[in-house]
Regions:
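Conserved short alpha-helical segments that host acidic/polar catalytic motifs at enzyme active sites
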Residues: 1-249, 253, 262-286, 300, ...
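A SIS-like phosphosugar-recognition module
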Residues: 168-169, 180-182, 188-189, 207-251, ...
Length: 601
């Protein structure tokens, strides 16, 4: 949530800052702004607009030149999405600008104290308290903005990424982070600060991640990181493995559709070098239970993981909503393995649950897509999914690779605990290896979904039914439709229909059914469920690996092991949600009210 960009160098700052904000649009926002020091010691040039980034760009048609600047896309938490509440915020002299991602929990107390000291506030935000506090601290530290930032961070409660710039020292930008991402881009005669490497990858592939409660000061030729005590921290640089073109649409009308079609490669990349074993220093024999913690789509991937790990590894698995987990004081200890799943590696609820589990002695083995992320760094081991950048807010290829990660972990546990024979492991490996090609096959057959889906664009409700691993797949299908089409959608286990949900069925209600493997007991059960809803007027769309004749519309997928079926059956569900959103005229890549990376609780 929120996008942050800072640039200082030899070139005009306007282009890299605005372009960087554009690359961060996927994070979700409702306003945008920029601050530029155009004259030393004079008030900063500032422009901010509610709405889309284009509103800001239109207002920047005649902007004075500056070689440094900071920019921000805001997701409203304190105060509505207005020009006034948009970032950056200024001190009373207009020389100091600050942008912020996160939530300052003690801002009311700070604001009250600052108002007593004569500070004038213009917005309703928690951020404005910080810029006034920083202004005072800078004066107390003889104009040293980095020292002032360290002082201020000690007074703040909550989570934050902060960036500040002052017109007295226009080439210096100071940043800080606590429980919220901030990364440095190290260039040649220019340096960057941003919430995500996507903001500056067109300019440099050398990055540096900040640790918890660290402060960074950049100039065009230097980067210095310190802790809150002022001690210099040696931060490790790394090279970004993907290129700028990966963040472009590549001829597709939307990022989401591009990412749906990138799934075969993402799956293959996640499997490479791992089918013979995971290179992690974890001995699974010491654990008595496993807890998977995640949110949203990652939670649904975790539910599938439970089936695989319990089947192949014969160890109990709980799947928990990260936002609820630590508040119920769960029982866990050194014999518990906790697996957090997060695409960004910065999901605040998941990070807080991870820290709670770690404090109780649990071992943390995380699944992330983003190298160098906070969750990855704070884990005992991490399995990176190699999905590449996922720009669309609604997750597709990240979900597919999270499923693959779950299977790889289940396979590793099964082998380590001797619950899988060499023959059984070989069959699983062969089935996993075949998945990229099978997803390609599914993608070749989804074109008819466009016309079919649009028939139901005005439906009041859509139900998704599944059994076994088809149930979490149904949950994911319903979530995608809610996110993108803004329609009421629910996912249910087929056997639960008669316990209440069947009351939702009316004439013409679309029901998407995920069929289990042919000739299985569950396939027979699902066929009965379908007859129940059809008898009440439902229109049934079945996703099946065999020619099921009981549906009104059939979407065929290739055969695979039942545990692996979600990788294939979810693809038509993603396409259904995408086409429904397009038919309803919605913003596919940036659905309303949603953010890609949820970095607040």
């Amino acid at each position: 949530m929120c996008g942050i960009v800072g640039y200082t160098g030899k070139n005009s700052a306007l282009t890299p800052v605005v372009d960087g904000l554009r690359k961060l649009e996927y994070r979700g926002y409702d306003s945008a702004g920029i601050a530029l020091p155009t004259e030393i010691g004079k008030p900063l040039f500032i422009e901010k607009k509610a709405g889309k980034l284009k509103n800001l760009e239109d207002a920047l048609a005649k902007t004075p030149n500056a070689t440094s600047g900071i920019g921000h896309t805001r997701w409203a938490t304190h105060g509505g999405p207005t020009d006034t509440n948009a970032h950056p915020h200024l001190d009373n002299e207009g020389k100091l600008a600050l942008i912020h991602n996160g939530i300052i929990e003690n801002y009311v107390q700070l604001r009250t104290e600052l108002e007593k000291r004569g500070h004038k506030f213009k917005s309703e935000t928690d951020t404005e308290s910080v810029v006034h506090l920083l202004s005072d601290a800078r004066k107390e530290n003889n104009g040293d903005l980095a020292a002032a930032m360290r002082q201020v961070c000690k007074q703040l409660k909550g989570s934050f990424t902060l960036l500040a710039i002052h017109s007295d020292d226009p080439s210096h930008i100071v940043g800080a982070r606590r429980n919220s991402p901030l990364v440095v881009g190290v260039g040649n005669g220019e340096n960057f600060l941003a919430s995500d490497v996507a903001a500056f990858i067109a300019h440099t592939k050398i990055a540096l991640e900040l640790g918890q409660d660290e402060v960074v000061e950049i100039t065009p030729t230097s980067v210095e990181v310190t802790n809150l005590a002022g001690q210099v921290v040696k931060s490790k640089q790394y090279e970004i493995s993907w290129d700028a073109s990966a963040a472009e649409r590549g001829g597709f009308p939307h990022f989401m559709l591009k990412e749906i079609y990138e799934q075969p490669k993402a799956i293959a990349d996640t499997l490479i070098g791992r089918l013979d074993g995971l290179n992690v220093k974890i001995k699974f024999k010491k654990f008595e239970k496993i807890v998977i913690i995640a949110c949203g789509t990652a939670y649904n991937a975790g539910l599938v993981g439970k089936y695989a790990i319990e089947k192949w590894g014969q160890i109990p698995v709980d799947v928990e909503l990260a936002s609820e987990y630590r508040y119920r004081e769960p029982s866990l200890d050194k014999k518990t393995l906790v697996i957090p799943i997060s695409q960004s590696g910065e999901t605040m609820d998941t990070l807080m649950a991870l820290r709670y589990a770690k404090s109780k002695g649990a071992t943390i083995f995380s699944v992330c897509n983003t190298n160098g992320s906070t969750i990855g760094r704070e884990s005992d081991a991490v399995l990176y999914t190699h999905a590449g950048p996922e720009i669309a807010v609604a997750s597709t290829k990240a979900f597919a690779t999270q499923l693959i990660a779950m299977y790889l972990i289940g396979l590793e546990i099964g082998k380590q605990l001797d619950h899988l024979s060499k023959k059984e492991s070989k069959v699983i490996i062969e089935q996993l290896s075949a998945l990229p090609a099978k997803v390609e096959q599914v993608l070749e057959t989804v074109e008819p979904l466009r016309e079919l889906t649009r028939k139901f664009k005005d439906s009041q409700s859509v139900l998704f039914l599944g059994r076994h691993v088809g149930y979490p797949t149904a949950l994911e299908g319903a979530l995608k439709l809610k996110e993108l089409a803004y329609m009421h959608a629910e996912g249910f286990a087929g056997g639960e229909l008669k316990h209440g949900p069947i009351a939702l069925i009316d004439k013409g209600t679309p029901v998407v059914a995920i069929m289990p493997a042919e000739h299985s007991v569950l396939a027979e059960k699902m066929a009965s469920n379908i007859q129940e809803v059809k008898a009440r007027g439902a229109v049934v769309i079945a996703i099946s690996e065999f020619d099921f004749i009981g549906a009104d519309h059939l979407i065929r997928i290739p055969k695979t092991d039942q545990l692996l079926q979600p990788v294939l059956s979810v693809v038509p569900l993603q396409v259904i949600a995408y086409e429904m959103a397009v038919a309803r005229g919605n913003d596919v890549d940036q659905p309303r009210n949603l953010a890609k990376s949820v970095t607040v609780e």
